[in-house]
Design a protein with these regions (language model features):
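Residue-level signal for inorganic ion chemistry
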Residues: 41, 96, 113
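Amphipathic, cytosolic membrane-interfacial segments at TM-TM junctions
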Residues: 100-116
């Protein structure tokens, strides 16, 4: 009786990885990740009015951040505070979608998760307002004093 070699027996336990088995690598993987990211942004735009409003605000504030006479670090803080709101809104929307996928019934834990997501968006908005107020407030005050 001939016994199979260890390489043969291990290959039967786990089939060898073949190209095209659903796993992508390299640039192709990055391309598909970007496509999924785009799909998430489009779905959130379509389903969430708050996200649409925040994107409209970002479209106004981001160019202003790059036109303000501030340091590079302050410019990054201004832009990051705007993008933070969008990031947290995307995460909040994903939490809400996952909970709604599980069940539309009211449940204390589902409500708590949605409330925490909403609170996170509020905290991000407060960070944005504080950042813009601290950096741009003095500049706005100087401009108003000079022109009024």
């Amino acid at each position: 009786m001939v016994r199979p070699s260890t390489s043969q027996s291990s290959s039967k336990a786990m089939p060898p990885s073949k190209p095209g088995n659903g796993k992508r690598s390299g640039l192709l993987r990055g391309f598909f990740a970007l496509r999924h990211s785009r799909d998430g942004i489009v779905a959130t735009w379509r389903e969430e009015s708050a996200f649409r409003q925040e994107v409209c605000i970002a479209v106004v504030l981001l160019p202003i951040a790059f036109l303000m006479p501030v340091t590079s670090a302050e410019r990054v803080l201004l832009a990051a505070s705007v993008l933070l709101v969008l990031l947290v809104e995307l995460i909040n929307s994903s939490i809400e979608a996952a909970i709604d996928r599980i069940s539309l019934e009211r449940h204390e834990l589902s409500g708590r998760a949605k409330d925490c997501g909403s609170a996170a968006v509020t905290v991000a908005l407060v960070i944005g307002v504080m950042t813009w107020s601290v950096i741009c407030g003095p500049l706005a005050w100087q401009w108003l004093r000079a022109h009024l």
